[in-house]
């Protein structure tokens, strides 16, 4: 959760609580998804109305519209609505994330939905630690785990050239707001700065202050945007 918070993907409820066991809505999932992608194009979709229940005045309109029309990662329901406040299911979540990773989603969609996507998510590591029935609602904590898994997931896709030769490409997903990373061990100096072991610099200033107790001793990747922050 802390990694996602530093990237701006997750937030508290206004009083500093994450509410890990609360169900995540379709609108909230779209916000997490689009924030992770880090595209500035999302602002263009703020005043667009695609669904009658997600008008331009809706708090999540820009995120829903961009995910649907801008990236075509998901769609509305057969009745033309989006149902932004309905809990998102595990099957819906992994389908969207596998499309984000540009894996062999076309092959998965040829089977019984969402089993093909669930199998892809398991094979790529996206669903590690979160394996549910396709129709089960996911919690905020489970969604956070899925998004953390996406950051390190290896996406595999296949293509066939004009001569009939098939090639497979494997890559690690790298969102627009995370252009580089360093494997480090954090040693907190204060709420604004962390000293590290294994990074290119001895210390880093944090964009979002954290308590020393949260940072101290953590091991993992530092994620950097285009400005090196």
Annotate each PLM feature.
Residues 1-228:
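N-terminal propeptides
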């Amino acid at each position: 959760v802390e990694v996602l918070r530093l990237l701006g993907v997750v937030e508290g409820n206004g009083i500093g609580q994450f509410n890990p066991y609360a169900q995540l809505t379709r609108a909230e999932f779209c916000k997490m998804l689009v924030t992770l992608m880090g595209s500035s194009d999302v602002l263009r979709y703020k005043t667009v109305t695609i669904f009658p229940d997600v008008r331009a005045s809706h708090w999540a309109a820009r995120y829903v519209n961009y995910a649907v029309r801008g990236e075509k990662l998901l769609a509305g329901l057969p009745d033309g609505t989006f149902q932004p406040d309905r809990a998102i299911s595990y099957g819906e979540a992994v389908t969207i994330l596998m499309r984000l990773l540009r894996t062999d989603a076309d092959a998965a969609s040829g089977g019984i939905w969402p089993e093909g996507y669930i199998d892809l998510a398991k094979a790529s590591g996206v669903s590690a630690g979160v394996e549910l029935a396709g129709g089960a609602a996911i919690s905020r904590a489970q969604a956070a785990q899925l998004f953390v898994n996406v950051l390190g997931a290896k996406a595999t896709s296949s293509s066939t050239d004009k001569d009939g030769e098939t090639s497979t490409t494997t890559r690690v997903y790298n969102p627009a707001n995370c252009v580089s990373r360093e494997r480090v061990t954090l040693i907190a100096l204060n709420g604004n700065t962390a000293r590290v072991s294994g990074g290119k610099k001895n210390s880093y200033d944090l964009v979002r202050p954290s308590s020393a107790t949260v940072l101290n001793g953590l091991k993992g990747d530092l994620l950097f945007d285009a400005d090196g922050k």
